[in-house]
Amino acid sequence: GDYTVKAAVTPVAGSMSELSRSISVSDTEAAMVVSNDFPACREEVVFSLNRMTGVTGVSWDFGDGSERRQTASASETLTHSYAEEGRYTVRAEVAYADGGTETLMRQIEAAGLSLSWACRNFDPSKMWIMAHRGNTKNGYELPPNSMAAFRRCVELGCVEFIETDVQITKDGEVICLHDNYLSRFTDYNDYASGKGMVADFTLEELGRFRLKTTDGKVSDQKIPTLEEVLMEFRGKVWFNLDKCMESDVSIEKVYDVVERCGCLDRVQFYISDDTDRADWLSRQKPQGIIAPHANKEEVLTRMAAYSPVYMIQTSTQYAGASWISSINARALSVTNLLDDEGQAFYNGNTTVMDGFVSAGVRMIQCDYPAEMDEYLRGRGKR
């Protein structure tokens, strides 16, 4: 780019003066620019070159057997998606005005399925399952929001989404923990009294604590970082990141981690009805997938106007046929079967869940995903 450097000069005697100089900076070597080196299948990946002068054309080979494509300059972009999982070598043959040529190469690894593509192609006769806090047995066997719990969800093979919660440490790291304090879900009170606010501890300091199960048993599990979670599970399951609307959670920091892990098309940011954060996510390049909450028509209309929005959550008591139909007209409806109603379902009372199925709910968040999968299979919803 072009820059103007200014220097304010103050002499020993006399008045201050300002000097300025214009500088132009350009790349001296061509390099391939890719929006995501680790995309999901069907994700739209953007390819281009850096701002290299003297480029007269580029021939692109995406390494998957698709037809070569051409661009006329370094600044021109191309979008490509991969249909199947695998590792691909992308080649860009660059032609220069002086007659020279150069071949650039980049490795791309595609895994899992694009969340946006899957939502746009959702089968309305089916229902997805989201594991609340990564629970499989309501957090009694494995602690909520633990790596062990998330692994169990993936092993089950019936969980499309894991819901987890994000918090920010004293040194700005993003971790996965339901509360913004430590006493309920860790063994913090074995060391100190009080609640222990997450924001008062660095990531290193949090490393001494261990997560607890729902009934308070201390496990061997540490509090995971969001980066650890996404790097291990990208391409295996999608994530719903709760708490992105909270004032003590930096949406910018959460977004940065998701982007760095190549998961912007594998994750949605739950922001409830926070229009400021919805607007911020929609303005990013690439955009973050917005996951709103709406219990009223005016909120639904307002939040559905943002993009990209593929799913809209509603509270259990509002999830009747008429309201679910209104949500489904704009996005995919999501509701919860948790707490007493979730326990009743586990004990064999399917009345509430029967109503959700009849209403046309598209995804159910629950603490018993294996049992939910069995129930939904019996109703032809899987």
Segments (PLM) and residue ranges:
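Extracellular/lumenal mature domains of secreted and surface-exposed proteins
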Residues: 1-127
